Amino acid sequence: MEERIIMSQECISEGLAALSNLEPKFDQIIPKMDKIPLRRRSDGFDRLLSTIVSQQVSVAAADAIWRKIKLAGFNKITKIKKASDQELRDVGLSKQKIKYVRSLANSKIDYRSLRTMPTSQVVKELTQVSGIGNWTAEIYAMFSLGRADVFAPGDLALQEATRLLFNLKERPSEKELRSIAKDWSPWQAVAARLLWSYYNQQKKREGIR
């Protein structure tokens, strides 16, 4: 695998320098931004489960649910398999999310082999599991595997940040933003981090966990 892996804050700085040359709008805002977070996470079942919990809910709501899940021990495969639906509802999971969580617990994902797969293959492998769409797979590749050239164009905060920064009338669609983000290769994941920080600055709230 020849893909660049984001390992440290120095990688973020390198990516920001490259993005300044690629996109004038980025060049304008980077000096005005606080430190762009590294956002590297561990990989494995626990982190993928956490990303599923984050789907289509606010950062605050996801954090609250995740705290309850960890307290109950439901961040472990064996505990989820033994849990009743009511026990999973009690920690804040919706009926649909319970299905997704059980699907993940029963999946045969080889987390170790994901580390050396091309990003496109990682997304393909993960999205075979019910409840894992492109957004979840791309966020996992970005934060847990450290891939530098992956974006999550289905993310509403990234869409809104792009609309604000580029003075667009409407948020770009997932398809439109995917096309736009290709211009930021090979540092799409750093562009995403920059846009989330810009969203936070403009909206005074976090756009990503």
Which sequence ranges carry the predicted segments?
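Alpha-helical ds-nucleic-acid-binding substructure associated with the helix-hairpin-helix region
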Residues: 4-6, 22-25, 29, 57-58, ...
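Alpha-helical scaffolds flanking conserved acidic
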Residues: 13, 43-47, 79-82, 120-123, ...
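Generic structural marker for isolated residues within well-ordered, non-membrane alpha-helices
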Residues: 50, 66, 84, 123, ...
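Residue-level detector of well-ordered alpha-helical segments, enriched
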Residues: 44, 48-49, 61-65, 97-100, ...
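Conserved short-loop catalytic and cofactor-binding motifs
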Residues: 50, 89, 110, 146, ...
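Structural motif
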Residues: 38-47, 92-95, 181-189
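C-terminal accessory module of base-excision DNA glycosylases/AP lyases that mediates lesion recognition
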Residues: 1-36, 103, 116-119, 134-209
